Protein backbone atom coordinates (compact mmCIF):
# COMPACT_ATOMS: atom_id res chain seq x y z
CA UNK A 1 0.00 0.00 0.00
CA UNK A 2 1.20 3.49 -0.80
CA UNK A 3 2.30 5.52 2.27
CA UNK A 4 -0.23 8.24 1.48
CA UNK A 5 -3.10 5.77 1.42
CA UNK A 6 -1.79 4.17 4.58
CA UNK A 7 -2.12 7.50 6.37
CA UNK A 8 -5.60 8.15 5.03
CA UNK A 9 -7.09 4.70 5.65
CA UNK A 10 -6.77 3.12 9.11
CA UNK A 11 -5.30 -0.36 9.22
CA UNK A 12 -7.19 -3.23 10.91
CA UNK A 13 -5.95 -4.71 14.13
CA UNK A 14 -2.82 -6.82 13.88
CA UNK A 15 -4.42 -9.80 15.60
CA UNK A 16 -7.25 -9.95 13.09
CA UNK A 17 -4.81 -9.71 10.19
CA UNK A 18 -2.69 -12.60 11.47
CA UNK A 19 -5.74 -14.78 12.02
CA UNK A 20 -7.02 -14.09 8.51
CA UNK A 21 -3.69 -14.95 6.94
CA UNK A 22 -3.32 -18.18 8.88
CA UNK A 23 -6.85 -19.38 8.19
CA UNK A 24 -7.00 -18.55 4.48
CA UNK A 25 -5.37 -21.63 2.97
CA UNK A 26 -6.94 -23.89 5.57
CA UNK A 27 -10.41 -22.80 4.49
CA UNK A 28 -9.48 -23.33 0.84
CA UNK A 29 -8.34 -26.87 1.54
CA UNK A 30 -11.61 -27.70 3.26
CA UNK A 31 -10.00 -29.24 6.30
CA UNK A 32 -7.87 -31.71 4.29
CA UNK A 33 -4.84 -33.52 5.63
CA UNK A 34 -1.60 -31.54 5.98
CA UNK A 35 0.17 -33.84 3.52
CA UNK A 36 -1.83 -32.41 0.61
CA UNK A 37 -1.22 -28.80 1.61
CA UNK A 38 0.56 -26.87 -1.21
CA UNK A 39 3.39 -25.71 1.02
CA UNK A 40 3.96 -29.22 2.34
CA UNK A 41 4.01 -30.59 -1.20
CA UNK A 42 6.53 -27.96 -2.27
CA UNK A 43 8.79 -28.86 0.62
CA UNK A 44 8.50 -32.55 -0.21
CA UNK A 45 9.26 -32.01 -3.89
CA UNK A 46 12.29 -29.89 -3.01
CA UNK A 47 13.56 -32.63 -0.70
CA UNK A 48 13.09 -35.31 -3.38
CA UNK A 49 14.77 -33.17 -6.01
CA UNK A 50 17.76 -32.76 -3.71
CA UNK A 51 18.63 -36.40 -4.34
CA UNK A 52 21.19 -36.39 -7.19
CA UNK A 53 19.86 -38.00 -10.33
CA UNK A 54 21.75 -41.03 -11.61
CA UNK A 55 21.57 -42.66 -15.03
CA UNK A 56 22.88 -46.20 -15.32
CA UNK A 57 23.31 -45.92 -19.09
CA UNK A 58 25.22 -42.63 -19.30
CA UNK A 59 26.92 -41.83 -15.99
CA UNK A 60 30.72 -42.24 -15.71
CA UNK A 61 31.28 -42.76 -19.41
CA UNK A 62 34.14 -45.14 -20.16
CA UNK A 63 34.77 -46.03 -16.52
CA UNK A 64 32.57 -49.11 -16.13
CA UNK A 65 33.39 -52.64 -17.21
CA UNK A 66 31.71 -53.96 -20.32
CA UNK A 67 28.30 -55.38 -19.46
CA UNK A 68 28.29 -53.98 -15.90
CA UNK A 69 25.71 -51.30 -16.73
CA UNK A 70 23.42 -53.98 -18.08
CA UNK A 71 23.76 -55.96 -14.84
CA UNK A 72 23.07 -52.87 -12.69
CA UNK A 73 19.97 -52.05 -14.69
CA UNK A 74 18.59 -55.58 -14.46
CA UNK A 75 19.47 -55.80 -10.75
CA UNK A 76 17.58 -52.61 -10.00
CA UNK A 77 14.60 -53.90 -11.94
CA UNK A 78 14.53 -57.17 -10.00
CA UNK A 79 15.10 -55.55 -6.57
CA UNK A 80 12.42 -52.92 -7.10
CA UNK A 81 9.58 -55.37 -6.46
CA UNK A 82 10.66 -56.41 -2.94
CA UNK A 83 12.55 -53.29 -1.85
CA UNK A 84 10.83 -51.46 1.08
CA UNK A 85 10.91 -47.79 0.18
CA UNK A 86 9.88 -46.50 3.65
CA UNK A 87 11.94 -48.73 5.87
CA UNK A 88 13.48 -47.09 8.93
CA UNK A 89 16.89 -48.45 9.97
CA UNK A 90 17.74 -48.96 13.63
CA UNK A 91 20.93 -49.90 15.47
CA UNK A 92 20.38 -53.65 15.10
CA UNK A 93 20.41 -53.41 11.30
CA UNK A 94 24.02 -52.25 11.34
CA UNK A 95 25.30 -55.41 13.00
CA UNK A 96 27.43 -57.59 10.73
CA UNK A 97 26.09 -60.96 9.73
CA UNK A 98 28.38 -63.87 10.76
CA UNK A 99 27.60 -65.67 7.50
CA UNK A 100 28.74 -63.13 4.91
CA UNK A 101 30.06 -60.20 6.93
CA UNK A 102 27.48 -57.77 5.52
CA UNK A 103 24.95 -56.03 7.71
CA UNK A 104 21.29 -55.67 6.76
CA UNK A 105 21.59 -51.88 6.67
CA UNK A 106 24.51 -52.04 4.24
CA UNK A 107 22.62 -54.42 1.94
CA UNK A 108 19.56 -52.18 2.14
CA UNK A 109 21.54 -49.08 1.19
CA UNK A 110 23.19 -50.81 -1.78
CA UNK A 111 19.88 -52.12 -3.03
CA UNK A 112 18.38 -48.64 -2.56
CA UNK A 113 21.11 -47.18 -4.76
CA UNK A 114 20.43 -49.75 -7.48
CA UNK A 115 16.67 -49.21 -7.32
CA UNK A 116 17.03 -45.42 -7.35
CA UNK A 117 19.40 -45.53 -10.32
CA UNK A 118 17.00 -47.85 -12.15
CA UNK A 119 14.02 -45.58 -11.52
CA UNK A 120 15.93 -42.47 -12.61
CA UNK A 121 17.15 -44.24 -15.75
CA UNK A 122 13.65 -45.39 -16.67
CA UNK A 123 12.27 -41.91 -16.08
CA UNK A 124 14.95 -40.32 -18.25
CA UNK A 125 14.38 -42.81 -21.09
CA UNK A 126 10.62 -42.34 -20.92
CA UNK A 127 10.97 -38.56 -21.06
CA UNK A 128 13.37 -38.79 -24.00
CA UNK A 129 11.04 -41.12 -25.91
CA UNK A 130 8.03 -38.90 -25.22
CA UNK A 131 9.93 -35.83 -26.39
CA UNK A 132 11.03 -37.64 -29.54
CA UNK A 133 7.48 -38.74 -30.36
CA UNK A 134 6.12 -35.23 -29.84
CA UNK A 135 8.83 -33.66 -31.99
CA UNK A 136 8.37 -36.17 -34.81
CA UNK A 137 4.58 -35.84 -34.68
CA UNK A 138 4.82 -32.06 -34.88
CA UNK A 139 7.34 -32.10 -37.73
CA UNK A 140 5.75 -34.68 -40.03
CA UNK A 141 2.39 -32.92 -39.71
CA UNK A 142 3.89 -29.88 -41.47
CA UNK A 143 3.56 -29.78 -45.24
CA UNK A 144 6.94 -28.06 -45.55
CA UNK A 145 8.65 -31.09 -44.01
CA UNK A 146 7.07 -33.43 -46.57
CA UNK A 147 8.12 -31.24 -49.49
CA UNK A 148 11.61 -30.65 -48.09
CA UNK A 149 12.17 -34.35 -47.40
CA UNK A 150 11.09 -35.19 -50.94
CA UNK A 151 13.55 -32.65 -52.36
CA UNK A 152 16.35 -33.89 -50.07
CA UNK A 153 15.82 -37.53 -51.04
CA UNK A 154 15.60 -36.67 -54.74
CA UNK A 155 18.81 -34.65 -54.52
CA UNK A 156 20.67 -37.48 -52.77
CA UNK A 157 19.55 -39.97 -55.43
CA UNK A 158 20.69 -37.61 -58.19
CA UNK A 159 24.02 -36.96 -56.48
CA UNK A 160 24.69 -40.68 -56.05
CA UNK A 161 24.16 -41.19 -59.78
CA UNK A 162 26.47 -38.31 -60.74
CA UNK A 163 28.82 -37.42 -57.86
CA UNK A 164 31.22 -35.42 -60.08
CA UNK A 165 28.60 -32.88 -61.17
CA UNK A 166 29.62 -29.33 -60.27
CA UNK A 167 26.02 -28.12 -60.12
CA UNK A 168 25.01 -30.89 -57.71
CA UNK A 169 28.13 -30.27 -55.62
CA UNK A 170 27.18 -26.61 -55.27
CA UNK A 171 23.68 -27.63 -54.18
CA UNK A 172 25.20 -30.07 -51.69
CA UNK A 173 27.18 -27.29 -50.00
CA UNK A 174 24.05 -25.15 -49.91
CA UNK A 175 22.08 -27.93 -48.22
CA UNK A 176 24.88 -28.58 -45.73
CA UNK A 177 24.81 -24.92 -44.73
CA UNK A 178 21.23 -25.43 -43.53
CA UNK A 179 22.34 -28.02 -40.96
CA UNK A 180 21.99 -26.32 -37.60
CA UNK A 181 24.34 -28.58 -35.65
CA UNK A 182 27.96 -29.46 -36.23
CA UNK A 183 28.03 -33.21 -36.04
CA UNK A 184 27.69 -36.53 -37.78
CA UNK A 185 24.84 -35.45 -40.05
CA UNK A 186 26.83 -32.61 -41.61
CA UNK A 187 29.90 -34.78 -42.15
CA UNK A 188 27.85 -37.61 -43.60
CA UNK A 189 26.08 -35.26 -46.02
CA UNK A 190 29.42 -33.93 -47.24
CA UNK A 191 30.55 -37.53 -47.86
CA UNK A 192 27.18 -38.86 -48.98
CA UNK A 193 28.69 -40.70 -51.97
CA UNK A 194 31.21 -42.58 -49.80
CA UNK A 195 30.54 -46.08 -48.39
CA UNK A 196 30.74 -44.83 -44.78
CA UNK A 197 27.64 -42.68 -45.37
CA UNK A 198 25.50 -45.56 -46.59
CA UNK A 199 23.65 -45.63 -43.27
CA UNK A 200 22.36 -42.11 -43.91
CA UNK A 201 21.12 -43.09 -47.38
CA UNK A 202 19.22 -46.02 -45.86
CA UNK A 203 17.69 -43.77 -43.22
CA UNK A 204 16.64 -41.21 -45.86
CA UNK A 205 15.03 -43.96 -47.93
CA UNK A 206 13.03 -45.15 -44.93
CA UNK A 207 11.90 -41.66 -43.96
CA UNK A 208 10.96 -40.83 -47.54
CA UNK A 209 8.93 -44.01 -47.83
CA UNK A 210 7.07 -43.43 -44.56
CA UNK A 211 6.53 -39.66 -44.65
CA UNK A 212 6.24 -38.90 -48.39
CA UNK A 213 5.00 -42.01 -50.17
CA UNK A 214 2.65 -43.47 -47.56
CA UNK A 215 0.08 -40.68 -47.79
CA UNK A 216 -2.74 -42.88 -46.49
CA UNK A 217 -1.13 -43.38 -43.06
CA UNK A 218 -2.20 -41.25 -40.13
CA UNK A 219 0.30 -39.17 -38.19
CA UNK A 220 0.33 -41.63 -35.29
CA UNK A 221 0.94 -44.54 -37.64
CA UNK A 222 3.85 -42.70 -39.23
CA UNK A 223 5.37 -42.04 -35.80
CA UNK A 224 5.05 -45.74 -34.96
CA UNK A 225 6.64 -46.73 -38.28
CA UNK A 226 9.56 -44.35 -37.70
CA UNK A 227 10.13 -45.77 -34.20
CA UNK A 228 10.05 -49.32 -35.57
CA UNK A 229 12.58 -48.40 -38.25
CA UNK A 230 14.86 -46.74 -35.70
CA UNK A 231 14.79 -49.78 -33.39
CA UNK A 232 15.41 -52.17 -36.30
CA UNK A 233 18.39 -50.18 -37.58
CA UNK A 234 19.79 -49.83 -34.06
CA UNK A 235 19.68 -53.57 -33.44
CA UNK A 236 21.20 -54.31 -36.85
CA UNK A 237 24.23 -52.06 -36.39
CA UNK A 238 24.61 -52.95 -32.68
CA UNK A 239 24.93 -56.63 -33.59
CA UNK A 240 27.48 -55.65 -36.22
CA UNK A 241 29.54 -53.79 -33.62
CA UNK A 242 29.56 -56.57 -31.02
CA UNK A 243 29.49 -59.40 -33.57
CA UNK A 244 26.97 -61.21 -31.40
CA UNK A 245 23.24 -61.60 -30.95
CA UNK A 246 23.49 -60.37 -27.35
CA UNK A 247 23.99 -56.61 -27.08
CA UNK A 248 24.17 -54.81 -23.70
CA UNK A 249 21.05 -52.80 -23.13
CA UNK A 250 22.97 -49.59 -22.47
CA UNK A 251 24.82 -49.79 -25.80
CA UNK A 252 21.61 -50.54 -27.67
CA UNK A 253 19.93 -47.56 -25.97
CA UNK A 254 22.80 -45.25 -26.97
CA UNK A 255 22.69 -46.37 -30.62
CA UNK A 256 18.92 -45.95 -30.55
CA UNK A 257 19.35 -42.43 -29.17
CA UNK A 258 21.82 -41.61 -31.94
CA UNK A 259 19.32 -42.62 -34.62
CA UNK A 260 16.47 -40.75 -32.92
CA UNK A 261 18.48 -37.53 -32.80
CA UNK A 262 19.51 -37.99 -36.44
CA UNK A 263 15.87 -38.44 -37.47
CA UNK A 264 14.90 -35.20 -35.74
CA UNK A 265 17.82 -33.38 -37.39
CA UNK A 266 16.82 -34.67 -40.84
CA UNK A 267 13.21 -33.58 -40.33
CA UNK A 268 14.33 -30.13 -39.14
CA UNK A 269 16.60 -29.85 -42.19
CA UNK A 270 13.68 -30.87 -44.41
CA UNK A 271 11.56 -28.18 -42.78
CA UNK A 272 14.20 -25.56 -43.59
CA UNK A 273 14.43 -26.76 -47.20
CA UNK A 274 10.66 -26.92 -47.64
CA UNK A 275 10.24 -23.30 -46.57
CA UNK A 276 11.54 -22.17 -49.97
CA UNK A 277 8.36 -23.41 -51.66
CA UNK A 278 6.09 -20.53 -52.70
CA UNK A 279 3.12 -22.29 -54.29
CA UNK A 280 0.76 -24.56 -52.44
CA UNK A 281 0.64 -28.08 -53.85
CA UNK A 282 -2.83 -29.62 -53.81
CA UNK A 283 -3.35 -33.33 -53.49
CA UNK A 284 -4.86 -34.96 -56.57
CA UNK A 285 -8.23 -36.52 -55.77
CA UNK A 286 -10.77 -38.33 -57.88
CA UNK A 287 -13.59 -36.49 -59.60
CA UNK A 288 -16.18 -38.06 -57.33
CA UNK A 289 -14.53 -36.55 -54.25
CA UNK A 290 -13.99 -33.07 -55.66
CA UNK A 291 -16.14 -30.26 -54.35
CA UNK A 292 -18.46 -28.76 -56.93
CA UNK A 293 -17.78 -25.29 -58.30
CA UNK A 294 -19.78 -22.48 -56.80
CA UNK A 295 -21.20 -19.65 -58.90
CA UNK A 296 -18.22 -17.39 -58.36
CA UNK A 297 -15.70 -20.05 -59.36
CA UNK A 298 -17.84 -21.07 -62.34
CA UNK A 299 -17.98 -17.50 -63.68
CA UNK A 300 -14.24 -17.14 -63.15
CA UNK A 301 -13.59 -20.32 -65.16
CA UNK A 302 -16.00 -19.11 -67.85
CA UNK A 303 -14.19 -15.79 -68.09
CA UNK A 304 -10.86 -17.60 -68.49
CA UNK A 305 -12.36 -19.81 -71.19
CA UNK A 306 -13.76 -16.81 -73.09
CA UNK A 307 -10.53 -14.85 -72.97
CA UNK A 308 -8.26 -17.80 -73.80
CA UNK A 309 -6.57 -18.14 -77.20
CA UNK A 310 -8.32 -20.67 -79.43
CA UNK A 311 -5.28 -21.20 -81.65
CA UNK A 312 -3.58 -23.23 -78.93
CA UNK A 313 -6.44 -25.70 -78.97
CA UNK A 314 -6.33 -25.99 -82.77
CA UNK A 315 -2.58 -26.49 -82.78
CA UNK A 316 -2.83 -29.01 -79.95
CA UNK A 317 -5.03 -31.25 -82.05
CA UNK A 318 -8.09 -31.07 -79.81
CA UNK A 319 -10.36 -29.67 -82.54
CA UNK A 320 -8.49 -31.09 -85.49
CA UNK A 321 -11.51 -33.19 -86.45
CA UNK A 322 -13.63 -30.04 -86.85
CA UNK A 323 -11.19 -28.37 -89.28
CA UNK A 324 -11.96 -29.11 -92.92
CA UNK A 325 -9.27 -30.36 -95.25
CA UNK A 326 -7.83 -28.25 -98.04
CA UNK A 327 -9.75 -30.20 -100.68
CA UNK A 328 -13.07 -29.33 -99.03
CA UNK A 329 -12.34 -25.65 -98.58
CA UNK A 330 -13.34 -24.95 -102.17
CA UNK A 331 -16.63 -26.87 -102.08
CA UNK A 332 -19.52 -24.61 -101.25
CA UNK A 333 -21.67 -21.78 -102.47
CA UNK A 334 -19.90 -18.76 -103.91
CA UNK A 335 -16.79 -20.61 -105.05
CA UNK A 336 -15.96 -21.48 -108.62
CA UNK A 337 -15.60 -25.01 -109.87
CA UNK A 338 -11.97 -24.38 -110.66
CA UNK A 339 -11.12 -24.88 -107.01
CA UNK A 340 -12.02 -28.53 -107.34
CA UNK A 341 -10.56 -29.03 -110.81
CA UNK A 342 -7.32 -27.11 -110.24
CA UNK A 343 -6.28 -27.52 -106.59
CA UNK A 344 -2.79 -26.21 -107.37
CA UNK A 345 -4.29 -22.82 -108.17
CA UNK A 346 -5.51 -22.34 -104.60
CA UNK A 347 -3.64 -19.87 -102.45
CA UNK A 348 -4.13 -18.95 -98.83
CA UNK A 349 -3.31 -15.81 -96.90
CA UNK A 350 -3.06 -15.29 -93.17
CA UNK A 351 -3.90 -11.82 -91.96
CA UNK A 352 -3.71 -10.42 -88.45
CA UNK A 353 -6.48 -7.99 -87.58
CA UNK A 354 -5.96 -4.88 -85.41
CA UNK A 355 -7.92 -6.47 -82.54
CA UNK A 356 -5.46 -9.34 -82.29
CA UNK A 357 -7.56 -11.96 -84.14
CA UNK A 358 -6.33 -13.90 -87.14
CA UNK A 359 -8.22 -14.17 -90.44
CA UNK A 360 -7.63 -16.81 -93.05
CA UNK A 361 -8.56 -15.88 -96.64
CA UNK A 362 -8.67 -18.11 -99.70
CA UNK A 363 -7.61 -16.82 -103.10
CA UNK A 364 -9.09 -18.78 -105.98
CA UNK A 365 -7.62 -18.54 -109.44
CA UNK A 366 -10.72 -19.01 -111.56
CA UNK A 367 -11.18 -19.04 -115.37
CA UNK A 368 -13.24 -16.46 -117.21
CA UNK A 369 -14.12 -16.41 -120.93
CA UNK A 370 -12.42 -13.84 -123.08
CA UNK A 371 -14.12 -11.85 -125.79
CA UNK A 372 -12.38 -13.84 -128.51
CA UNK A 373 -13.16 -17.18 -126.87
CA UNK A 374 -9.79 -17.61 -125.10
CA UNK A 375 -9.00 -17.70 -121.45
CA UNK A 376 -8.72 -14.41 -119.67
CA UNK A 377 -6.23 -13.48 -116.96
CA UNK A 378 -6.71 -15.42 -113.76
CA UNK A 379 -9.25 -13.72 -111.58
CA UNK A 380 -9.19 -13.75 -107.80
CA UNK A 381 -12.24 -14.41 -105.73
CA UNK A 382 -11.94 -14.07 -101.97
CA UNK A 383 -13.76 -15.90 -99.27
CA UNK A 384 -13.14 -15.41 -95.59
CA UNK A 385 -12.77 -18.79 -93.94
CA UNK A 386 -13.12 -17.74 -90.33
CA UNK A 387 -11.72 -15.88 -87.36
CA UNK A 388 -9.92 -17.59 -84.53
CA UNK A 389 -9.45 -15.85 -81.21
Curated annotation (Swiss-Prot):
The keyword Cell cycle does not apply. Cleaved at different sites by the viral protease during virion maturation. Residues 350-389 are annotated as: Disordered. Pfam families: Adeno_52K. Residues 362-374 have a biased composition (Basic and acidic residues). One of its GO terms (biological process) is viral DNA genome packaging. Induction: Expressed in the early phase and late phase of the viral replicative cycle. GO terms for cellular component: host cell nucleus. Keywords: Host nucleus, Late protein, Phosphoprotein, Viral genome packaging, Viral release from host cell. Its main location: host cell. Residues 1-131 are annotated as: Interaction with packaging protein 1. It is found in: Host nucleus. The keyword Plastid does not apply. It comes from the Viruses. All late proteins expressed from the major late promoter are produced by alternative splicing and alternative polyadenylation of the same gene giving rise to non-overlapping ORFs. A leader sequence is present in the N-terminus of all these mRNAs and is recognized by the viral shutoff protein to provide expression although conventional translation via ribosome scanning from the cap has been shut off in the host cell. Part of the genome packaging complex composed of packaging proteins 1, 2 and 3; this complex specifically binds to the packaging sequence on the left end of viral genomic DNA and performs packaging of the viral genome. Interacts with hexon-linking protein IIIa; this interaction is required to promote correct genome packaging. HAMAP family: ADV_PKG3. Belongs to the adenoviridae packaging protein 3 family. Involved in viral genome packaging through its interaction with packaging proteins 1 and 2. After proteolytic cleavage by adenovirus protease, L1 52/55k protein is removed from the capsid during viral maturation. This is Packaging protein 3.
Amino acid sequence: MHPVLRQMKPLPASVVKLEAESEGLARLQGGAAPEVHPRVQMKQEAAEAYIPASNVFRDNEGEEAEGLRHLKYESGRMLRKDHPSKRVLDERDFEKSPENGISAAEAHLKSADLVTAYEHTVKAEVNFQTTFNNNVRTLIAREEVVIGLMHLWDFVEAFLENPVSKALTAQLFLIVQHCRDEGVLRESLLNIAEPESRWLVDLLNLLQTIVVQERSLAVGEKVAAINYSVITLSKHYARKIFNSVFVPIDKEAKINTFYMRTVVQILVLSDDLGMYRNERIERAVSGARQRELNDRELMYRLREALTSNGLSEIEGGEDSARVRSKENWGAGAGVGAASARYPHLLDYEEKENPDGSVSFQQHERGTQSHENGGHAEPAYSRRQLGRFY
